[in-house]
């Protein structure tokens, strides 16, 4: 009798565990779908904020299996990403990073190397005004002196904690850093 009770109890536990696993699988699937929908919304918001062509992209969809991102125009036609200019492609990549960070709900630092190199003036302005100040609690920018002009530096100054310049010393074969950004701390030469 005791063995029958054990067998029945084990069978009940297995059934219960199977049901719990099924519920968890369904929950994970729904959570994944919800996060993907949220990512689509955030990505569209970021692209509309960063791209200077109004209504270039009016909808974003993400495939649930492959996670491939499809951009759509106002007529809901798919826009091949290779038809975007190099600057628009960079803004797309930046938008994806921002949308992922927002979707995670966690503050993530951004480290960006030569962020403005391939951008036209309009996209540069958008990055300076709409991205760098708001991208994260911590944004580290590795740029050249030609990317962040004195004008851009002045615009970013209220958001800067510190800035450093790196100077290569050819005779010594090494690089030294100093406080400031190609100018002194106030952005003056």
Locate the predicted segments by residue.
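Conserved D-loop/post-Walker B switch-helix segment of ABC ATPase nucleotide-binding domains
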Residues: 107, 121-127
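Extended, charged coiled-coil "arm/hinge" scaffolds of SMC/Rad50-like chromosome-maintenance ATPases
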Residues: 1-70, 107
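C-terminal lobe/lid and adjacent interdomain/linker elements of RecA-like ASCE P-loop ATPase modules
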Residues: 125-189
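Conserved ABC ATPase signature
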Residues: 32, 36-37, 69-96, 115-121
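GG-anchored amphipathic helix commonly corresponding to the ABC/SMC/Rad50 NBD signature/C-loop
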Residues: 46, 86-111
